[in-house]
Amino acid sequence: MYRKMEVSLSKDLRKKYGIRSFPVIMGDVVKVISGSRKGEGGKVAEVDHASGLVVVEGITIARADGKQKGFGIQPEKLQITHLDLSRGDRFDKIKSLAARKNIVVEKPEPEPEPRKEETAEAQEAKEEAVAEEKTEVDDNDKQN
């Protein structure tokens, strides 16, 4: 069964876009506003339209065998704090809904992902620092 699962928006998003709720997808950042997990939040990991539940990263429940499993939360108990507008159709929908209330929405700047070269350089620098610390510890041990 397919069902659009709309989640209410936070107050600042309501003011920014002029809408009260919007369908939730993977990548949105949400927080729990009621229930036993109230106050917790994170990025949406899975949206299960068949059962009508949303799984959020970092919110888990222990299974009988001791492993952790994603905890399904009903969408009416969630609130979107950050929308993932990387998909163009989603941004167009927000833009058209905001236009009804005479609100102009600008396309957000995409967050740049770190390049592999930069992360490799940072990793090498970290390894060098660890190697220097080890040699200092070895030198101190030899002197004592």
UniProtKB/Swiss-Prot annotation:
Renumbered residue ranges of the record's region Disordered: 102-144
Gene Ontology CC annotation, any one: large ribosomal subunit
Cited SUPFAM superfamilies: Translation proteins SH3-like domain
Domain of life (superkingdom): Archaea
An MF annotation (GO) of this entry: rRNA binding
Gene Ontology biological process terms, A to Z: translation
Spans traversing the lipid bilayer: none
CDD domains: KOW_RPL26
Acidic residues bias spans: 135-144
Composition-biased stretches (Basic and acidic residues): 103-134
Gene3D superfamilies found in the cross-reference section: 2.30.30.30
Cited NCBIfam families: rplX_A_E (TIGR01080)
General function of this protein: One of two assembly initiator proteins, it binds directly to the 5'-end of the 23S rRNA, where it nucleates assembly of the 50S subunit.
Protein name (record): Large ribosomal subunit protein uL24
